[in-house]
Amino acid sequence: MSFPYEYIFKYIIIGDMGVGKSCLLHQFTENKFVPDSPHTIGVEFGTRIVDVNNKKIKLQIWDTAGQERFRAVTRSYYRGAAGALLVYDITRRITYNHLTTWLTDARNLTNPNTVIMLIGNKKDLEGQRDVTYEEASAFAKQNGLIFVESSAKTGENVEEAFLRTAKLIFQSVQEGNVDLIPDGGITKNPPQTITDKPQDASKCSC
């Protein structure tokens, strides 16, 4: 068989409960908004193949639960993440105030070269905004994060968030800053094409 992609990048999505992590995952992988998406219990998983610099890359995305009682379980999924999407709700300051705790976990439990993207979600609710763009941008700059505001409902900047993260991970690969091993969150498929040996029809029992 031949692989339809050359690399696999592991992502995790982290942040408080109700910030729209699962909605971001569904919007990116299925191009749809699920308004009544139930709160994630443990983890949820999704994949999508994207094109970065003419290379096919499979993104394996782990959406983690935001509730405190699941933190011990979800922390195990941080290991080996090549990219981390740190999400808060621009209409709920409490979710922004908790970013430092989430970021500390990400820094302690992932790799030094993990790309961390800060996402201010629910941009479609501008009239209810409780965290300014400038404030979050300053936080991102201070902590060396990439930053974007998005809307899982309208799809605004969702694609950009995932793809921009993938481009920075791929850049690290090209520069030799990361190891191509599963524990590093990045796997490279063999360059050769593997062909299944056809079965001898004369030996088939039909």
UniProtKB/Swiss-Prot annotation:
<feature type="region of interest" description="Disordered">
    <location>
        <begin position="182"/>
        <end position="206"/>
    </location>
</feature>
<dbReference type="GO" id="GO:0055037">
    <property type="term" value="C:recycling endosome"/>
</dbReference>
<feature type="lipid moiety-binding region" description="S-geranylgeranyl cysteine">
    <location>
        <position position="206"/>
    </location>
</feature>
<dbReference type="GO" id="GO:0005765">
    <property type="term" value="C:lysosomal membrane"/>
</dbReference>
<feature type="binding site">
    <location>
        <begin position="15"/>
        <end position="22"/>
    </location>
    <ligand>
        <name>GTP</name>
    </ligand>
</feature>
<feature type="lipid moiety-binding region" description="S-geranylgeranyl cysteine">
    <location>
        <position position="204"/>
    </location>
</feature>
<feature type="modified residue" description="Cysteine methyl ester">
    <location>
        <position position="206"/>
    </location>
</feature>
<dbReference type="GO" id="GO:0031164">
    <property type="term" value="C:contractile vacuolar membrane"/>
</dbReference>
<dbReference type="InterPro" id="IPR027417">
    <property type="entry name" value="P-loop_NTPase"/>
</dbReference>
<comment type="similarity">
    <text>Belongs to the small GTPase superfamily. Rab family.</text>
</comment>
<dbReference type="GO" id="GO:0012505">
    <property type="term" value="C:endomembrane system"/>
</dbReference>
<dbReference type="InterPro" id="IPR030702">
    <property type="entry name" value="Rab14"/>
</dbReference>
<feature type="binding site">
    <location>
        <begin position="121"/>
        <end position="124"/>
    </location>
    <ligand>
        <name>GTP</name>
    </ligand>
</feature>
<feature type="binding site">
    <location>
        <begin position="63"/>
        <end position="67"/>
    </location>
    <ligand>
        <name>GTP</name>
    </ligand>
</feature>
<dbReference type="GO" id="GO:1905364">
    <property type="term" value="P:regulation of endosomal vesicle fusion"/>
</dbReference>
<dbReference type="GO" id="GO:0090382">
    <property type="term" value="P:phagosome maturation"/>
</dbReference>
<dbReference type="GO" id="GO:0006971">
    <property type="term" value="P:hypotonic response"/>
</dbReference>
<dbReference type="GO" id="GO:0005811">
    <property type="term" value="C:lipid droplet"/>
</dbReference>
<dbReference type="InterPro" id="IPR005225">
    <property type="entry name" value="Small_GTP-bd"/>
</dbReference>
<comment type="function">
    <text>The small GTPases Rab are key regulators of intracellular membrane trafficking, from the formation of transport vesicles to their fusion with membranes. Rabs cycle between an inactive GDP-bound form and an active GTP-bound form that is able to recruit to membranes different set of downstream effectors directly responsible for vesicle formation, movement, tethering and fusion. Regulates the fusion of phagosomes and lysosomes.</text>
</comment>
<dbReference type="GO" id="GO:0005802">
    <property type="term" value="C:trans-Golgi network"/>
</dbReference>
<dbReference type="GO" id="GO:0032456">
    <property type="term" value="P:endocytic recycling"/>
</dbReference>
<dbReference type="GO" id="GO:0140220">
    <property type="term" value="C:pathogen-containing vacuole"/>
</dbReference>
<dbReference type="GO" id="GO:0005764">
    <property type="term" value="C:lysosome"/>
</dbReference>
<dbReference type="GO" id="GO:0042742">
    <property type="term" value="P:defense response to bacterium"/>
</dbReference>
<protein>
    <recommendedName>
        <fullName>Ras-related protein Rab-14</fullName>
        <ecNumber>3.6.5.2</ecNumber>
    </recommendedName>
</protein>
<dbReference type="GO" id="GO:0006886">
    <property type="term" value="P:intracellular protein transport"/>
</dbReference>
<keyword id="KW-0967">Endosome</keyword>
<keyword id="KW-0547">Nucleotide-binding</keyword>
<keyword id="KW-0449">Lipoprotein</keyword>
<dbReference type="GO" id="GO:0006895">
    <property type="term" value="P:Golgi to endosome transport"/>
</dbReference>
<feature type="short sequence motif" description="Effector region">
    <location>
        <begin position="37"/>
        <end position="45"/>
    </location>
</feature>
<keyword id="KW-0378">Hydrolase</keyword>
<dbReference type="GO" id="GO:0006970">
    <property type="term" value="P:response to osmotic stress"/>
</dbReference>
<dbReference type="GO" id="GO:0005829">
    <property type="term" value="C:cytosol"/>
</dbReference>
<keyword id="KW-0472">Membrane</keyword>
<dbReference type="GO" id="GO:0003924">
    <property type="term" value="F:GTPase activity"/>
</dbReference>
<keyword id="KW-0488">Methylation</keyword>
<keyword id="KW-0926">Vacuole</keyword>
<dbReference type="GO" id="GO:0045335">
    <property type="term" value="C:phagocytic vesicle"/>
</dbReference>
<dbReference type="GO" id="GO:0048548">
    <property type="term" value="P:regulation of pinocytosis"/>
</dbReference>
<dbReference type="InterPro" id="IPR050209">
    <property type="entry name" value="Rab_GTPases_membrane_traffic"/>
</dbReference>
